[in-house]
From Swiss-Prot:
Keyword line: 4Fe-4S, ATP-binding, DNA damage, DNA repair, DNA-binding, Exonuclease, Helicase, Hydrolase, Iron, Iron-sulfur, Metal-binding, Nuclease, Nucleotide-binding
Lineage: Bacteria, Bacillati, Bacillota, Bacilli, Bacillales
EC number of this enzyme: 3.1.-.-
Protein name as annotated: ATP-dependent helicase/deoxyribonuclease subunit B
Required cofactor names: Mg(2+); [4Fe-4S] cluster
Name of the top EC class for this enzyme: hydrolase
Source organism (scientific name): Staphylococcus epidermidis (strain ATCC 35984 / DSM 28319 / BCRC 17069 / CCUG 31568 / BM 3577 / RP62A)
Gene that specifies this protein: addB
């Protein structure tokens, strides 16, 4: 029984002395008594390599490198005694989750959180922590019974104790955790002859749990010799840099005292690791209360960067410089980090520099396509085939990889199901998934070519293939009752999917392509999945569960699966966290992310037991628990010390001034402290360094080209750049091995987001030799020429979704109002409440099922919306009744179409216009409502357009003038051209151009007491007052509102009279008849100019900004035109918004410009 400890600061040769001692014994007696080297899990591989790579040893039969768990396994193999099944991490969490579900009603604090997966994970961590520190359910129960505890803490401890006790009961004699197996290992250690003959060395630890101290004590009792290596100066001061390892030393002394033996201490005071004074000064002066600054020899460097990405780019450049100029191997270099955000940056940046690396961290399998497929499959069953879960399943492409162009087929299928809102067992309806239904995609029926028919047949075939697999899986799972049945059915389903053979084929293809890491991932995913199924059977076996319970427990298991990737090559950069990485004796260490808040890190408790509760439990239950946050905070300096003393030659510290989310970051106070250790150590600003020495950025051809792009862009913008960048460009351009991709970069330098004007032939191919178009198409061109080109030239369409759009609502109102108007022949004024209700119900029952494949009957929300639509229609009809009672104008036509060649007598004729190129313009459309009033040989017409949006229910004459609002003038022109078809007199004149807002008004009152019924009705009707422009002819005004008299303000149309009977210009919207004709003529001119521009091939990205609003705000093509609001303001067109359109039109008329012959 010999107990030793090696004590010394970092770099004093403790580990080297131990290894040399072991090697000498192996050389003297290769088959002698066993030597056991116990190290942390992450260090075992490196230590094994130390023996394998030794030229004199070439491995070892006598020495074994183990961590505590593997040591216990080795002893159990020798003496037996472990009969229970060891639970994996996933199995433990699945068992705890199931216990929580069973006892949900018994939990006082965590009952409401029982369904959350995270709770079982936290409970597993807490129970494992208790086991490491030898805390049992009895300890917790005694604490609760014998002490007065705060209610919340009491309920928490009662819940944890209940779950802990149930877990112990469930495992009793059948299962065992890692911590329990270590407890048993301690008990049977005395039976091991192997241990009795062994010399044990323990290295790489800075602290131990209570359980590990008990193992060390048992080893000291039964092994020939135990030696523990500690990085400490032996100081026991509570605020010492070495507080943590010194605490370990105190525990070792306690063990020696209990065993009544001496703890032999060997002190190491000479530094061997550091090859220069910089590193010696760094080690010696860090965290010292008194230090003497030394002159800097350039072996310790600090640089700051503007961003984290630029920081890692600089590290990559410096690594290449190390390898190229200092003759380092990649394996001589390590990168240490603390902020998890850096892990992604390493994986995205280092490969672009061709730097091999290995990150010593486990990565979740959650986002692997196979795992995504499995979890989607579970969600499909859980959600009763919800559309989102089904599409996720398809998009993994795991079940559809046998189809050519499967991704494209899935995209087409997605378009279809999103349009139809497929859910539940509608996925099985073959009438929905038919060629005929696919031909109606986009709300219009299309004649399919043979090629399209074949394509959609393949889509249907792909859909059926996946649906059959899902049906098989669902049926198999529904027939199961026990966990063993479920697991068996699950595996059989995977075989039915032919997944095992598919994955083997993929793995072989990846290995042939040299993608060994990706191939290894497939192996690990499959093995992990099988392990979860095995764990389920092991833990639950024939226990009955509902399908939902099984899927929940299974999902918990999948959550725990992680990739453990072994290094793919021996010569690679080691990357790890500062807390865990084992990277001793590297030539160059890069410590990145040295920012305040990261090092030192603000430590907070993330366990179920808070720091205050830990202290309470320790004080009253007389146990020791894991360190609290304040203790861990004290050890932050030690974390930094251990990380920076791993190097033999150089250490480079770096930090960024800005985080990934754009937040400002500060330098770590540790770096400020390190800087003070040297007289002339300066922090290098990368921006200044690269400006002065641009060659430092040119370490790799690919990245140099990317940087070159930035500098050449500045050069083209007449910025001053270093001539060496131009030299680099010429060198790369003239080198066939380096210039790949350079043309693409240089082309993008001169790229301007400009479209090309189409030639005459291409314009006619896109638009035809005749322009057949609606008014809105011309308005769209005026808003932005590119918008017109994208929608009508390229014919780009947004994906149609199974949801109600704004234009759907407008279409519904138009259809319902037309139906009712036709039924009553436009006689709104004679409607009564009963008629209004019955007609509305009748119209909705007929029209709503036709909207978006019966969308409005698909959910409770849409059924409520249907009722709301009905209420709005009824309100609108009441307003129309009121307006009809006080107007001489009579509704004559509803939803009246017009075109060059009418299809029937009900449609109107639209006379073609001619572009400047001589191309006919055939305008077509539909007028919502035409009202007429005839007196003698004069007829007057109103154009009324229904709008469901208040913002669009306004006639803006400035917009009319500039061609942004062409609808009303066009409609009036068409009606005036068709007096015969409308049955009007020979003399037809414009009455009003009016918008009617279809809505349900909301009247605001300060309080219930302020409500006056008469005033309420007046305000209600005023909300339906039509807006627009009226002919100021007194005959027209009198007919529009028969109540017109002095001091009267109409609540029907925009007209008001003064006390003297004159038109109130402020409250009225009127114009002379000739002005209206002039507006119509000007509108025609806008049509001709717009159509001529279209046929000239204009496609500019040139949105027209009006009243500080851009059409881009509501445009569907922003992702195509790439217009940028910050940098493309020069593209915006504007108009003079201060003009008075009616005055301008009058001026044109006076100058003899545009004229109109009314008849």
């Amino acid at each position: 029984m010999e107990f030793n400890t090696y004590i010394g600061r970092a770099g004093t040769g403790k580990s080297t002395a131990m290894l040399n001692q072991i090697k000498n014994k192996m050389k003297q007696d290769p088959l002698g008594d066993p030597i056991v080297l116990i190290a942390p899990t992450q260090s075992t591989f490196q230590l094994e390599q130390a023996f394998v790579n030794d030229s004199e040893l070439h491995g070892s039969l006598r020495t074994e490198v183990l961590h505590f768990e593997r040591l216990s396994h080795r002893v159990f193999q020798e003496v037996g005694g472990l009969t229970e099944q060891r639970l994996s991490k996933a199995a433990l969490e699945m068992m705890i989750f199931h216990i929580v579900q069973q006892h949900e009603s018994d939990l006082k604090l965590y009952g409401s959180q029982a369904q959350y997966y995270g709770l079982s994970e936290k409970l597993a961590e807490q129970i494992q922590d208790f086991k490491k520190y030898n805390v049992t359910p009895e300890h917790l129960n005694q604490l609760i019974e014998n002490h007065s505890i705060q209610t919340r803490t009491k309920h928490k401890l009662e819940d944890i104790s209940l779950i802990y006790k149930q877990l112990e009961s469930r495992m009793n004699g059948e299962f065992i955790t890692t911590e329990d197996s270590l407890q048993q290992f301690i008990e049977i250690l005395s039976q091991s002859q192997w241990i009795k003959k062994a010399e044990v060395f323990i290295d790489g630890f800075h602290n131990f749990s209570t359980l590990e101290y008990r193992i060390i004590e048992a080893l000291v009792q039964h092994a020939k010799q135990v030696t523990v290596l500690l990085t400490t100066d032996g100081s026991h001061h509570p605020f010492s840099l070495f507080r943590k390892p010194s605490e370990v030393l105190s525990h070792l002394e306690d063990i020696a005292n209990r065993l009544n033996i001496n703890l032999n201490k060997t002190y190491f005071n000479t530094f061997y690791r550091y090859n220069n004074d910089d590193l010696k000064n760094l080690e010696n002066g860090f965290d010292a209360l008194q230090f003497t600054p030394k002159h800097h020899q350039n072996h310790v460097k600090i640089f700051e960067s503007s961003s984290m990405r630029e920081e890692i780019n600089e590290v990559a450049r410096r690594i290449l410089k190390d390898v190229r100029e200092a003759d380092y191997k990649f394996r001589d270099i390590a990168i240490l980090y603390r902020d998890e955000s850096y892990a992604y940056l390493f994986e995205s940046i280092l490969p672009s520099y061709d730097i091999p690396f290995n990150i010593d961290t486990k990565k979740s399998m959650t986002h692997h396509p196979i795992m995504e497929m499995l979890r989607s499959l579970l969600e499909v069953i859980r959600s009763n085939w919800h559309i989102n879960a089904m599409l996720r399943l398809f998009k993994t492409n795991v079940l559809t990889s046998q189809f050519k162009r499967s991704s494209y087929l899935i995209d087409l299928l997605e378009n279809f199901v999103l349009e139809r809102g497929i859910y539940g067992k509608r996925w099985l309806d073959e009438d929905i998934f038919s060629i005929d239904q696919f031909s109606r995609m986009g709300r219009k029926s299309h004649q399919l070519t043979e090629g399209h028919q074949a394509l959609y047949k393949e889509v249907i075939k792909l859909k059926k293939n996946v649906i059959n697999k899902v049906l098989y899986f669902e049926q198999a799972m529904n027939e199961a009752h026990t966990v063993k049945d479920y697991a068996t059915s699950f595996y059989e389903s995977l075989e039915y999917f032919e997944l095992p053979s598919q994955l083997m084929t993929q793995r072989d293809e990846l290995e042939l392509a040299g993608l060994t890491e990706k191939a290894e991932e497939i192996d690990q995913v499959w093995n992990g999945l099988i392990q979860i199924l095995d764990d389920l059977v092991t833990v639950f076996d024939d226990q009955e569960m509902t399908l939902q319970q099984f899927l929940d427990v299974f999902d918990i298991g999948l959550e725990q699966l992680e990739f453990v990737m072994i290094p793919q090559t021996l010569d690679q950069v080691s990357i790890g966290t500062m807390d865990l990485a084992k990277v001793d004796n590297k030539k160059h260490i890069y410590m990145v992310g040295m920012n305040d808040g990261i090092l030192p890190q603000t430590v907070s408790s993330s366990s179920l037991i808070t720091d205050e509760e830990k202290k309470y439990v320790e004080d009253n239950a007389h146990v020791e628990l894991s360190p609290t946050s304040d203790i861990l905070q004290m050890d932050e300096a030690f974390v930094c010390y251990i990380a920076m003393t791993r190097s033999q030659q150089s250490v480079t510290f770096s930090y960024s001034l800005m985080g990934n989310s754009g937040d400002e970051k500060e330098i770590s106070p540790f770096l400020t402290q390190i800087k003070e250790l040297f007289y002339d150590l300066e922090i290098t600003n990368l921006q200044d360094l690269h400006k002065a020495q641009p060659l430092l950025m040119m370490q790799h051809s690919h990245q140099t080209k990317i940087q070159l792009f930035e500098y050449l862009r500045g050069w083209l913008d007449h910025e001053d750049i270093d001539y060496r960048w131009l030299d680099a460009y010429l060198a790369i351009r003239d080198d066939d091995q380096l210039n790949q991709g350079l043309d693409y970069l240089t082309t993008s330098l001169t790229y301007d987001n400009e479209t090309v004007q189409l030639n005459e032939i291409l314009s006619q191919q896109l638009y035809g030799k005749t322009i057949n178009a609606s008014v809105s198409r011309f308005e769209g061109y005026q808003q932005c020429p590119f918008k017109h080109y994208a929608s009508h030239g390229l014919r780009l369409n947004e994906r149609t979704k199974y949801e109600l759009q704004n234009f759907d609502l407008g279409d519904i109102f138009h259809s319902v109002l037309k139906y009712i108007s036709d039924r009553i022949y436009g006689d709104f004024k004679n409607l009564d409440t009963k008629n209004i209700q019955s007609l509305t119900k009748e119209a909705l029952e007929l029209i709503l099922p036709k909207v978006q494949f019966n969308l409005l009957n698909s959910s409770a929300y849409y059924k409520y919306l249907s009722k709301k639509i009905g209420s709005i229609v009824e309100t609108t009809l009441k307003a129309l009744k009121y307006q009809g009672e006080y107007s001489k104008f009579v509704p004559q036509r509803f939803e009246t179409g017009f075109r060059k060649s009418p299809k029937n007598k009900g449609e109107l004729v639209a006379q073609p216009l001619i572009t400047n190129q001589g191309i006919p313009i055939n305008i077509r459309g539909q007028i919502d409502r035409i009202d007429t009033y005839t007196k003698g040989d004069h007829s007057y017409v109103n154009i009324i357009d229904y709008k469901s949006s208040e913002s669009s229910a306004t006639l803006d004459l400035t917009k009319v003038y500039y061609g942004l609002q062409m609808q009303m003038m066009t409609y009036m022109d068409i009606v005036l051209q068709n007096k015969e078809r409308l049955g009007l007199t020979d003399i037809v004149k414009p009455g009003g151009l009016l918008y009617f807002h279809v809505h349900e008004p909301r009247i605001k009152f300060k309080s219930w007491a302020d409500i006056d019924e008469d005033q309420f009705q007046k305000d209600y009707i005023k909300n339906f007052k039509m807006s627009g422009l009226l002919n100021r002819d007194q005959e027209v005004l009198d007919a529009l509102d028969i109540r017109l008299e002095p001091k009267y303000n109409s609540d029907i149309v925009p007209i008001a009279l003064t006390a003297k009977g004159a038109i109130n210009q402020r409250s009225s919207k009127v114009a002379d008849e000739n002005i209206i004709y002039q507006l119509i003529e000007h509108n025609k001119k806008n049509f001709i100019e717009t159509a001529s521009h279209i046929m000239d091939g204009h496609t500019e990205v040139a949105p027209l900004k009006y009243k500080q609003v851009l059409p881009c705000q509501f445009c569907n093509y922003k992702s195509v035109c790439h217009v940028d609001g910050l940098i493309d303001s020069k593209r915006y067109r504007t108009v003079d918004e201060s003009i008075k359109p009616l005055d301008l039109i009058q001026q044109l008329r006076n100058e003899g410009g545009e004229r109109h012959d009314s008849n």
